[in-house]
Amino acid sequence: MKNMNLAKCVVVLVITFIASMSTYAAKMNNNLIYNAEEVNGLKVSETVYKKDGNMLTNYMKYSYKYNANNQMTENMSQKWDANDNCWKNDLCIRYTYDNKSVTTEYYKWNSKKNDFILIPEMTVTMDK
């Protein structure tokens, strides 16, 4: 019986490994390379690079924030500006949780106001 459980675990591990490698290969075919940073098991940032021959160039950067329940509260994206050689804010998604629902609000960066501006028509509330 223990051998059967061990065999099942090995099969699951092999399938997971193959799926991970397939995902990695698919990302490589798109010429995008992903580099994630985790803290205490939570992804706090991810930088995406474009591959051009032997060169990697900055493309997108994502930052994530969480509440005390490890629920994502913010997902901010930035685009690389090659002219200014820096990251520029692009989009911010904020999540609000209550006992029965989660509300998702989308904000677009406004460089003139130097702030994220709510896009009200994209606000969505869903039951848990």
Q: Language-model segments: which ranges?
A:
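Bacterial N-terminal signal peptides that target proteins for export
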Residues: 1-11
